[in-house]
């Protein structure tokens, strides 16, 4: 059973095992269908019935029965198919790290739409092939690298939309899954064995982020990441809602105000 849904910016295609007596296609409201299935008891066997020429989908599960209005399959909008110029594969846990470590810095300002996402691009750093994810809102910046991503060819940097970054979790549940990534001029596609997520990319130019990263710093401090995070969390309890500021006052103390 194939399930396809879209909001014209993102399209998801999933497939599940089913006993199909009569093949066919139809369009039905996704939210209502989801709520019906979600509220059924665990392990329920669900049956979908649609008589030829009928504009209703009958859903039968145990002692429950629902009827939903349908539309012809031709009325369902499908994102235009195209050739993907660049394709490579990464483990699910690697993609999670790229986006989970960078997404907090994405902007929400609609006027600066080119910052509303994560900038993904290949580069060479210290003679090593790198796949880099960058996000910034103009006040903070996150840069995450993975080495030797196995790219057979290079591609120009793309901006993965904020909404797509949020929805990627559905395809990254199993850390050891191989995720195929395909990139074209205006789309990016993530796919595992059963689920495919296709998204438009942001049509804009990401700023030169390297210019704002300080270099030649004369003050450096190396700390245990988890201990530092816990310390910041403790002192931020008394910081103001407006500033949420935490200031290092020495090598051993933090202050919130």
For each predicted feature, which ranges?
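Structural preference for solvent-exposed beta-strand-turn elements
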Residues: 1-255
């Amino acid at each position: 059973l194939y399930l396809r849904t879209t909001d014209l910016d993102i399209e998801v295609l999933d497939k599940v095992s089913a006993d199909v007596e009569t093949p066919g296609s139809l369009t039905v409201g996704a939210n209502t269908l989801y709520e019906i299935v979600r509220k059924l008891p665990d392990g329920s066997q669900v049956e979908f019935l649609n008589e030829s020429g009928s504009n209703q989908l009958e859903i039968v599960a145990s002692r429950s029965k629902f009827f939903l209005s349908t539309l012809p399959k031709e009325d369902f909008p499908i994102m235009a198919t195209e050739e993907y110029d660049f394709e490579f594969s990464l483990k699910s846990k690697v993609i999670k790290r790229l986006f989970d470590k960078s997404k907090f810095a994405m902007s929400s300002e609609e006027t600066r739409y080119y910052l509303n996402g994560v900038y993904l691009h290949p580069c060479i750093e210290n003679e090593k092939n790198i796949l880099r994810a960058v996000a910034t809102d103009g006040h903070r910046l996150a840069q995450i690298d993975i080495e030797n991503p196995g790219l057979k060819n290079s591609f120009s940097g793309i901006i993965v939309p904020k909404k797509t970054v949020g929805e990627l979790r559905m395809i990254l549940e199993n850390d050891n899954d191989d995720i195929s990534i395909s990139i074209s001029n205006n789309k990016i596609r993530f796919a595992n064995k059963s689920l495919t997520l296709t998204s438009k990319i942001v049509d804009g130019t990401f700023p030169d982020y390297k210019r704002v990263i300080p270099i030649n710093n004369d003050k450096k401090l190396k700390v245990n990441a988890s201990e530092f995070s816990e310390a910041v969390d403790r002192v931020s309890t008394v910081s103001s809602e407006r500033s949420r500021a935490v200031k290092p006052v020495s090598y051993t103390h933090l202050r919130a105000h």
